[in-house]
Design a protein with these regions (language model features):
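Bacterial N-terminal signal peptides
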Residues: 5-17
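Eukaryotic scaffold repeat domains enriched in small/polar residues
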Residues: 21-384
Length: 384
């Protein structure tokens, strides 16, 4: 039997008992100790991205580094490669002009390495040998301060995203800078994915609230979406993946949902992740507890990280900021199980920002608050 939070509360059940009685199983996992071997002079920061190529090599995009990034903090982007046994191989793109504030790394079917840098508004493709050959977007020529037209509405929007209900006048636009939809240009992009024809899809992102598309030659084709909560609208599209049937899945974090589109941007369906929070298990490592939150990026189930397993029968792995769990989800939106709980120990999570899933039995997780990458070994398939 399935319980909604509201129904359970009306029945006088505690949050703990809701978790115990709802139908989503808690799935077993093993977190492998020290999966990556770092040189003595390299240190991880916030882990914005993690990816695995066809040879089992692991790529980590960390908010740390040896170069001087121009935005947000002194060193805010470093791309590292490890072999299948976790041995350090190299740093890619050292002192690269685009490095500013790491957000995502992905590997395409040809083993090219794609990085999304939120701070420089750039998405780059590296060849497997480690040199850039495609560049999307352009970094600004100088740092400057943008003064929002209405500071009160900016703060109201931030509070809304944290789950605090605020009254914002309809005529005021609390998004700043104002979204500008230009070809080959981004404003705080977040992720990238590809379809079976080699087209690229970009989630763009914190400001522009849209999805961009380029063809197999790297030529800009189109974009869709705008700021809002209706079908085909977004509030911080934070992750993106494409199924074998070429359906585009977008993690619409601020609206706490995953939307699905065809490759022309036509809306197909959407679904939400509704798994009650057991507040007695694990202490959150960021923000504040809001187990009954239904809106905003910090609400339970708001998709922060998104990964689709390869092969003909894929599943989704979705991570949230609060309470920091991983959900195993069918492509139709059924939650098949949940992994982990908030915390700092192995098998616990603090702000899941990146997931790589070379199979259902092997999951790599990048965390912002805990400054680490975990390798999770699981058992079972979507049919179990």
């Amino acid at each position: 039997m399935k319980y909604t939070i509201l129904a359970a509360l009306l029945a006088g059940l505690s949050i703990t008992s809701i978790f115990a009685q709802q139908s989503v199983p808690e799935l077993p996992l093993v977190s492998v100790p020290d999966p990556l071997k770092l040189p003595a002079d390299i240190h991880l920061g916030e882990i914005a991205g993690v990816a695995v190529n066809s040879h089992g090599h692991i790529f980590v995009f960390s908010r740390g580094g040896s170069s001087m990034g121009p935005a947000y903090m002194e060193t805010a982007a470093q791309l590292l490669e490890f072999d299948a046994n976790g041995n350090f191989i190299r740093e890619i793109g050292k002192n690269l002009n685009a490095w500013s504030y790491a957000h995502a790394v992905r590997i395409d079917p040809q083993d090219n390495i794609w990085v999304v840098d939120k701070g420089s508004n750039m998405i780059l493709r590296f060849r497997p040998e480690g040199h850039v050959d495609w560049v999307f977007g352009r970094k600004g020529e100088a740092s400057h301060i943008q003064v929002p037209p209405d500071y009160i509405t900016i703060m109201a929007r931030m509070l809304n995203q944290m789950g605090v209900d605020m009254e914002v006048p309809e005529e005021l636009n609390p998004r700043w800078p104002v979204p500008v939809h230009s070809d080959n240009a981004f404003n705080q992009p977040t992720d990238v994915a590809w379809d079976s024809q080699g087209n690229s899809y970009f989630s763009d992102g914190y400001i522009n609230s849209r999805v961009g598309k380029a063809n197999h030659r790297g030529e800009w084709v189109m974009s869709w979406g705008s700021l809002g909560s209706g079908p085909g609208q977004f509030d911080t599209p934070h992750g993106i993946a494409v199924s074998p049937d070429d359906e585009v899945y977008v993690a619409d974090r601020g609206n706490r949902r995953i939307q699905v589109f065809d490759t022309d941007g036509n809306y197909i369906r959407e679904f939400t992740i509704n798994v009650p929070v057991d507040t007695s298990r694990g202490k959150i490592t960021y923000g504040r507890e809001n187990p009954l939150g239904t809106t905003g990026s910090l609400a339970p189930g708001a998709p922060d990280a998104l990964c689709m397993t390869p092969g003909p029968n894929p599943v989704l792995f979705v991570g949230d900021v609060y309470p920091s769990r991983i959900y195993k989800v069918s492509l139709e939106g059924e939650v098949l199980g949940v992994y982990g709980q908030p915390g700092r120990n192995l098998g616990e999570f603090g702000w899941i920002h990146a997931i790589a899933c070379p199979s259902e039995e092997e999951i790599w997780v990048g965390e912002l608050i805990n400054w680490r990458v975990q390798k999770l070994v699981t058992h079972g398939t979507a049919q179990d």
